[in-house]
């Protein structure tokens, strides 16, 4: 039996929860500019599967890589770290 490899995880903020069982999570990170040595904030948006529709906009969540669930969804919500108040 082969074991499943380590899956990638990301932490981000839910920016949209308008779809059924799907949330859009924005993951931000800092990148150093090669010439000016200044750190620039870059962000990527991922569509993630939320089975119970428990995530709301503004929540901080951890997402984990999974098999393709649809055309755009390749991530699944593992846990809600902080609720937005």
UniProtKB/Swiss-Prot annotation:
One of its GO terms (biological process) is translation. Part of the 30S ribosomal subunit. Keywords: Ribonucleoprotein, Ribosomal protein, RNA-binding, rRNA-binding. The keyword Magnesium does not apply. GO terms for cellular component: cytosolic small ribosomal subunit. This is Small ribosomal subunit protein uS17. One of the primary rRNA binding proteins, it binds specifically to the 5'-end of 16S ribosomal RNA. GO terms for molecular function: rRNA binding; structural constituent of ribosome. CDD domains: Ribosomal_uS17. HAMAP family: Ribosomal_uS17_B. The keyword rRNA-binding applies. It holds the Pfam family Ribosomal_S17. Belongs to the universal ribosomal protein uS17 family. InterPro entries: NA-bd_OB-fold (IPR012340), Ribosomal_uS17 (IPR000266), Ribosomal_uS17_bact/chlr (IPR019984), Ribosomal_uS17_CS (IPR019979). The gene is rpsQ.
